[in-house]
Amino acid sequence: MTQEERFEQRIAQETAIEPQDWMPDAYRKTLIRQIGQHAHSEIVGMLPEGNWITRAPTLRRKAILLAKVQDEAGHGLYLYSAAETLGCAREDIYQKMLDGRMKYSSIFNYPTLSWADIGVIGWLVDGAAIVNQVALCRTSYGPYARAMVKICKEESFHQRQGFEACMALAQGSEAQKQMLQDAINRFWWPALMMFGPNDDNSPNSARSLTWKIKRFTNDELRQRFVDNTVPQVEMLGMTVPDPDLHFDTESGHYRFGEIDWQEFNEVINGRGICNQERLDAKRKAWEEGTWVREAALAHAQKQHARKVA
C-alpha cells in the first residue's frame, strides 16, 4: 500500500491525521490556508469589539466584552499553534495577512456604529461561526479538531452573551428597539456571507469535503444558520431585512433572498468599508510589539542556556 493509499484509507476510516503522518502537499497547503485564515479572523475580530470596551454602557457589559476580546486572542493563538504543526511559521502566515496575501473573515470589515452592533455581533456573527465551527470539531486533521472543541465551548458563551445583550435592548425603549433593528439590518446579510460563496462558485470546497477537512457545504451551513436564527429574531420582536424570506412547509426550511455577491467580492478583495483600517491597526500593533517579541525571545534563550549549563 502506498503512502497516499494509506492516507486515503485513514480518511475513509475517520482516523485523524496527525502532524507526524504522511499527507499530500495539497492537503497540507489547504489546511495552512484554512487554519491561517481562521486564526487571522480571530485576531482581526478583536478590533470591532475592542472599539467599544471603553464605551460599554455598564461596568458589567465592559467586563463581559473585555473577557470576550481576550478569548478571541486566545483562539487566534490556538489556531496559529495548530497551523505550525503543519510546518509553517506563524510569523510567516501573519505577515502574509498584513501584506494582503492571506484573507480573514469578511464580516470584520464592517464598522460597529452602535452598542447594538456589539450585541448583534455576539449573537449573529458568533452564531454563524458556531454553525461552521461545530462541524470542524470532526475535521480530519487532529490538531485543528482538538483546538475547535475548546473554541466552540467559548464561542457558545459569546453567542449567548450577545443574545442576552440584544434581549435587553428588545425589552427597552423604542429608541433601543430601533437601534437593535438597525444593527440587525446592517449585519444580517454580512453574516450570511460568512459561509463563503455558493457551492457552485466555491473552488476549494470539493477537495476539502473529499478529505473531510470540511463536513458540510457552504450552502448547507448557511441554511442551517438561517433555520436556527430566524425564530430567534422573531422572538425578539425584530424583523429579518429580507422581503423574500418565508418558511417552506414542504422542505421544512426557510427560503431567503439572493445574497449580494458583488458586495462580498468587493470586501474580500480589500475594498470594504474597514479593510484598510483593520490592516493598518494590525500593522501598527505588529511594529509596536517588536520589543515585546524580542524580549520574550531573549528571556527564552536565557532560560534555555541555564538549563543546558
Curated annotation (Swiss-Prot):
Residue positions binding substrate: R33, Q37, K103, Y104, S105, S106, N132, M193, S202, P203, N204, K214, N218
Looking at the keywords, is Oxidoreductase present? yes
Among InterPro entries, the record links this protein to: Aromatic_CoA_ox/epox (IPR052703), Ferritin-like (IPR012347), Ferritin-like_SF (IPR009078), PaaA (IPR011881), PaaA_PaaC (IPR007814)
Which of UniProt's keywords are assigned here? NADP, Oxidoreductase
Q: What induces it?
A: Activated by cAMP receptor protein (CRP), integration host factor (IHF) and by phenylacetyl-coenzyme A (PA-CoA) that prevents PaaX from binding its target sequences. Inhibited by PaaX.
Task: Name any Gene Ontology BP term.
Answer: phenylacetate catabolic process
Query: Any idea which GO molecular function terms this record carries?
Result: phenylacetyl-CoA 1,2-epoxidase activity
Subunit structure of this chain's protein: Forms a stable heterotetramer (dimer of heterodimers) with PaaC.
Under which name does UniProt file this protein?
1,2-phenylacetyl-CoA epoxidase, subunit A
